A protein has these predicted regions:
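Exported/periplasmic ABC-transporter solute-binding proteins
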Residues: 61-108, 112-308
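Intrinsic-disorder-associated, low-complexity terminal segments enriched in Asp/Asn/His/Tyr and depleted
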Residues: 11, 16-17
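Low-acidity, Ser/Thr- and Arg-rich intrinsically disordered low-complexity segments
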Residues: 2, 7-10
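Bacterial N-terminal signal peptides
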Residues: 44-57
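Short, low-complexity, charge-dense intrinsically disordered segments
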Residues: 6, 20-29, 307
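Short stretches within intrinsically disordered, low-complexity N-terminal or propeptide regions
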Residues: 5, 21-22, 36, 53-55
């Protein structure tokens, strides 16, 4: 199976992290390690344990992709998850008796599950790193990473450098952006999240997200916090922005579908499905549906940009 070739700058989300001072635990939701380790090591260990735990759960839904004995399992990115659930719902309506189980867990966990054969398809919102490139990848959509604030926040635009400095912890107060004084409540995703890894590549470059940021384990959790906190700032899949939060422009460009399609909006990444081998049988039929005009229209209707 082949999809329309798409050119995108490749990157590796793996990098070293600066050491953090010992601190009381737990500091924030999403911090998984109760030891005085560096921030990167602490969260990497947490991501590893999470991936191993999820892998055991994924085995329960995994069939062989060809027989009718088990549900097909799609597992991984929480950014891809709601869109995969919509596709699965429509596909099962059109194919009575077919069963598709969609699970989250994060891009890295989904990729690992696909590598180990614990999921028929892994879902990723980041590019594959070198050690993962033996997997067969299928681009299914383009998505933007939207920077979001509370609807009451008058902020409408951030420069890319300003955004970087906020997440570095160099800009910490709304006063520094010309707004009434109050500390900025910075919200980020956990390590292992494809959204975070894409954000680190596209925004942070060789710098690091401040240990002072509140860590959340899904796009939905970030959105809920920002929706309830007038002083917060976070980032989520552009396809998941709703009227509870406000997306701000980056360098004067909003994350609209047209701007994502043209890539005038710079925070853009692909959504991928991955497997150990090219899909066959029931799995191939599902992928064909996702890449069909109907499947792509469904993704477009949900706020993504189709690849075909």
């Amino acid at each position: 199976l082949s999809a329309t070739p798409i050119s995108i700058m490749s990157y590796s989300p793996q990098k070293d992290h600066p050491a953090a001072e010992p601190r009381k635990w737990p500091r924030s939701k999403g911090e998984l390690c109760p030891f005085s380790l560096g921030t990167g090591m602490c969260l990497r260990l947490g991501s590893l344990f999470l991936a191993l735990g999820l892998l055991l759960g994924f085995w329960g839904c995994r069939g062989d992709g060809t027989s009718d004995a088990h549900a097909l399992c799609i597992a991984g990115s929480t950014s891809v998850q709601p869109f995969a659930e919509k596709l699965a719902e429509v596909y099962m309506q059109q194919h009575p008796g077919e069963r598709i189980d969609v699970q989250g867990g994060g891009s890295s966990a989904g990729i690992y599950a696909a590598q180990q054969g614990a999921a028929d398809l892994g879902a990723s919102s980041r590019e594959l790193v070198e050690a993962e490139k033996a997997l067969h990848e299928i681009p299914i959509a383009w998505d933007g990473i939207a920077v979001i604030v509370h609807p009451s926040n008058p902020l409408n635009n951030l420069g890319l450098e300003q955004l970087r400095q906020i997440f570095q912890g160099k800009i910490t107060n709304w006063r520094e952006l010309g707004l009434p004084p109050h500390a900025i409540d910075t919200i980020t995703r956990e390590e292992g999240s494809g959204t975070r890894e894409a954000f680190e590549h596209l925004v942070m470059g060789k710098t690091f997200i401040t240990p002072g940021a509140l860590v959340q384990d899904s796009n939905g959790a970030v959105r809920e916090i920002v929706a309830g906190d007038p002083y917060s700032l976070g980032y989520i899949s552009a396809g998941l922005v709703d009227d509870r939060v406000k997306a701000v422009a980056v360098d004067g460009i909003l994350p609209t579908r047209e701007n994502i399609k043209k890539q005038t909006y710079k925070l853009v990444r692909r959504f991928l499905l991955v497997g150990r081998v090219p899909p066959a049988g029931r799995c191939r039929a599902l992928v064909d549906f996702i890449l069909s005009p109907q499947g792509q229209r469904l993704l477009e209707a949900e706020g993504l940009v189709g690849v075909n």
